[in-house]
Regions:
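Alpha-helical adaptor scaffolds
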Residues: 180, 184-218, 235
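TPR repeat positional signature
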Residues: 49-56, 188, 192-195, 228-231, ...
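Generic structural signal for hydrophobic core residues of well-folded globular domains
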Residues: 60-64, 151, 195-199, 235-236
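Generic local-structure boundary detector
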Residues: 198-205, 238, 285, 289-292
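Glycine/small-residue-rich hydrophobic helix-like segments
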Residues: 209-250
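Alpha-solenoid helical repeat scaffolds
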Residues: 186-190, 224-230, 260-266
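N-terminal alpha-helical interaction modules that lie
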Residues: 1-184, 241-316
Length: 316
């Protein structure tokens, strides 16, 4: 059956190549184009939940990027006093946030369906399944991330999606099913994120911030910066510009040659998220998006003369 062959080829051969790609728009649009074809195989009994979860998560990226552009235009127009333009851009942004969030909710639901069918596992509840394949672990990670992204887009849209608020605690529990070391410290960063966003006490929140920073440090060692994006998301939600600046600096400080080439696509996705936060922060403070490079060198940071220059001046 062609559907089963397509599934096998996609998971065993195409996916590893896709994960090594740094061309996010190509991957995004390819997922948009292939989605209906994959859906059509469901009626013939082909297992499509995994492919659809990955595909919808990927397809949401371009829509979310368009939403960010509208948000920036709205902020800029508002600063210029162009009220109608600002309002129109904001409405367009909310609709795009809705569309991106719907895709992400569907990606999460396909993840939930996959683990229910294959392992009889209710996502984020009870005992973790004994996952057999690495690609299934990746699916769990991507599905959980999609749910959190959907929640962000829901809020940004003005709750046009109405994402179930019972999902975040399930995500925390599901992250415990993944090996934190194997997956670059990202599972712990997600757990720490929700500790900070919904803290049980001031002490728990303080520890959550430390855990987020520790996750970024571990990610730097193994060449993956997903935890940096989590750190930035939480800093933005909590309105902590000090932590946002720290997250941006940590992210930019990692040399490109250290990035894990086998998962370059995931790092590029994190890069897009960080660029979005940098653009928002610069727009809010300076009235334009972040510089093309060195966006974590902020406008209020004075250039410090080098020790060598100081020595030369002392000898004059």
């Amino acid at each position: 059956m062609i559907g089963n062959h397509l599934r096998s080829y996609t998971i065993n051969h195409a996916l590893p190549v896709i994960l090594k790609s740094d061309d996010v728009p190509v991957i995004c649009h390819a997922n948009e184009g292939m989605g209906p074809l994959v859906m059509s195989f469901t009626q013939f009994g082909v297992e499509t939940d995994m492919m659809l979860a990955f595909g919808l998560a990927g397809a949401s990226i371009c829509t979310e990027n368009s939403a960010i552009e509208k948000e920036l235009w709205s902020s800029l127009a508002e600063r210029q006093g162009w009220t109608n333009v600002a309002q129109d851009a904001r409405l367009a942004q909310q609709l795009l946030n809705r569309d991106a969030g719907i895709r992400q909710v569907r990606a999460f639901q396909h993840t939930v369906d996959y683990f229910k069918k294959q392992y009889n596992y209710d996502f984020g509840e009870g005992t973790c399944p004994k996952i057999k394949l690495e690609v299934e672990e990746l699916l769990l990670l991507v599905g959980a991330t999609s749910a959190l992204q959907a929640l962000q887009n829901d809020v940004a849209s003005g709750r046009l999606i109405n994402v179930d608020m019972a999902i975040p605690p399930k995500i925390v529990h599901a992250m415990a099913c993944l090996d934190n070391t194997k997956w670059w410290g990202f599972p712990k960063s997600v757990q720490a994120a929700l500790t900070v966003v919904i803290p049980e006490s001031p002490e728990a929140e303080a520890q959550g911030w430390k855990d987020l920073q520790s996750a970024t440090e571990f990610g730097e060692k193994v060449g993956m910066r997903l935890s940096h994006a989590t750190y930035a998301v939480v800093a933005s939600i909590k309105g902590r510009d000090d932590h946002l600046r720290d997250a941006l600096k940590r992210f930019e400080a990692v040399p490109k040659e250290k990035i894990n080439p086998d998962y370059l696509l995931l790092d590029q996705l994190a890069d897009i998220v960080m660029r979005h936060f940098a653009d928002r922060y610069w727009m809010r403070s300076e009235g334009h998006r972040a510089p093309t490079e060195n966006y974590s060198k902020f406008w209020d940071e004075k250039e410090q003369p080098s020790a060598e220059l100081n020595g030369m001046l002392d000898n004059m």
